[in-house]
A protein has these predicted regions:
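Structural motif
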Residues: 52, 74, 81-83, 90, ...
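Short beta-strand His + acidic residue motifs that chelate non-heme Fe in jelly-roll/DSBH
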Residues: 64-66, 84-85, 101, 107-113
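Ligand-binding loop in jelly-roll beta-barrel domains
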Residues: 103-128
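Conserved short histidine dyad/triad with adjacent acidic residue
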Residues: 38-39, 53-68
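Short acidic-glycine-tyrosine-enriched beta hairpin
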Residues: 89-103
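Short, conserved beta-strand element in jelly-roll/cupin
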Residues: 57-59, 68-84
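A short, N-terminal "cap"/entry segment at the start of jelly-roll beta-barrel domains
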Residues: 1-50, 131-160
Length: 160
């Protein structure tokens, strides 16, 4: 096992050190309607208070063109593979591979014969995806409120 990171009690503190950031929620990514920004490139963003996770699906033969943005991005490959260009360092990424993209660093990705599912984590949330993510969040909150009305206290479904 690797060396301990430090005092577990301070890492897992139960004492708030500031204002609560809001109310937590659960999201099933399959319930998020995918938006196709380019043919074969589907986005399913999930918005947090200070960050965003975008579940991205690439069909075979799809490209996310080389681009830059002000948000830091962490790319996590969940299944399949794609080729990733990180400022000219081009690599094939597969399940478990992670790329860290600092702000304003050129990057892009493409698939050839296979598909790929990856998660992009943006801090702060990616500006160009905010309206989409906010709409998805509102839709999910509405569905969650409706589902909560159908459950008994303790989270169990109601009914006889």
């Amino acid at each position: 096992m690797s060396e301990a990171l430090g005092d577990a009690a301070s890492h897992f503190t139960t004492e708030a050190q500031g204002e609560r950031g809001g109310i937590g929620r659960y999201v099933n990514v399959d319930s998020v309607t995918p938006v196709e920004f380019l043919p074969g490139l589907g986005f399913r963003p999930v918005l947090g208070q200070r960050g965003m996770a975008n579940f991205v699906s690439f069909e075979p033969g799809t490209e996310a063109p080389r681009h830059v943005h002000e948000e830091e991005q962490i790319v996590i490959v969940v299944e399949g593979e794609f080729t990733f260009d990180l400022d000219g360092d081009v690599r094939t990424m597969r399940r478990g591979d992670v790329a860290v993209v600092p702000a304003w660093v050129p990057h892009g990705a493409w698939t050839t014969d296979s598909s790929c599912l990856e998660i992009d984590v943006f801090v702060p949330p990616r500006e160009s995806l905010l309206k989409l993510a906010e709409a998805q969040s509102a839709e999910a909150s509405s569905a969650a409120a409706q589902a909560a009305g159908e459950q008994e206290p303790g989270g169990q479904p109601g009914g006889a």
